[in-house]
Amino acid sequence: MALWGGRFSSGPAGDVFALSQSIDFDWRLAPYDLRSSLAHLNVLENAKLIEKSDAGAIRKVLKEMQVELAEGTLLPSDQDEDVHSALERVMTQKLGPLGGALRAGRSRNDQVATDLRLFAIDHMLQLAEFVIALQGAMLKKANEYKDAPAPGFTHLQHAQPVLFGHELAKHAHSLDRDLSRI
């Protein structure tokens, strides 16, 4: 789907189009774009800016696209400039002109910002799960080695002996602060 228009009689030269394409790296935003599109559809429907029957048809296609994306059968084409144009192209193929109805009331910049926020939240939650798993593993080992002596360090030099279990528990506990900042 061409994003170019207005006073131009044709699209950009091939090299310019290739330079402006971001589909190679922003396709990972597709699940978030579909989620934000469903939310935007709800807003349009609740504000009565889109007919209930049209909203139902769009919602059905968006959910089908989520399934296809998860299955790996929904893919961008070489002609898609970015994730948004790719998904709108598929919507328009499936729904005709109704597929472009989701453009109402939202800018491309807002769409990008929302998708990136959802992406970041999702990945931060995954990171938090990894940190919690690491803490659990460290505390399990801390209990296992609660009586094992180990060399303590201060200012990068050997200091008094400590219990290895205490060292592990100390580091596991210090990750609590990191978790609170995620």
PLM region descriptions:
Residues M1-I182:
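A helix-coil-helix interface module used to build multimeric assemblies
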